[in-house]
């Protein structure tokens, strides 16, 4: 939630114990306010959150002019762009110009005065950064195109995946 981001931003430069205490306090606050189910709150790995606070992804979030979370979009893109983003061969003829509906929810769009950045969280247990790039490159390419269309003339200049399992930001 945005309250968690605020709590983390307030202590991001603090010692690890202070960050962990803030995460635990926010977890308890959300459970008490019934914003999070107690069973889910109990499974929150505070050490993975600490690793996130120390990450490049969190530095980028804190440095943005605006942070758009769970940005839903639906747009039409030329079939040629959709096929190219998937790494497939482009068709010839009118099919390449046909519109394809692209719909999704971007985890985080970072807004800067002259550009945008796209961050996606992944919880799956892939082994290497290359595994994540292979699995999600097409998704992030299409999301970036859709977001650029919505926020023109600003361009998406960075696409990244934050792997909770690996604890790192992976550029796509």
Task: Locate each region found by the language model.
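Structural signature of nuclease core domains in nucleic-acid processing machines
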Residues: 2-172
């Amino acid at each position: 939630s945005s309250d968690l981001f605020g709590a983390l931003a307030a202590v991001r430069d603090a010692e690890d114990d202070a960050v962990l205490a803030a995460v635990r306090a926010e977890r308890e606050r959300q459970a008490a306010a019934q914003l999070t189910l107690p069973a889910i709150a109990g499974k929150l790995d505070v050490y993975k959150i600490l690793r996130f606070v120390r990450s490049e992804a969190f530095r980028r979030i804190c440095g943005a002019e605006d942070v758009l979370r769970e940005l839903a979009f639906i747009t039409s893109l030329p079939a040629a762009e959709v096929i190219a983003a998937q790494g497939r061969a482009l068709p010839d003829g009118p099919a390449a110009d046909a519109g394809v509906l692209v719909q999704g929810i971007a985890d985080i769009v970072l807004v800067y005065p002259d550009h945008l950045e796209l961050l996606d969280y992944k919880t799956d247990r892939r082994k290497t950064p290359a595994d994540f790039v292979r699995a999600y490159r097409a998704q992030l390419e299409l999301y970036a195109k859709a977001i650029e269309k919505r926020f023109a003339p600003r361009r998406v200049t960075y696409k990244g995946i934050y792997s909770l399992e690996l604890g790192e930001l992976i550029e796509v």
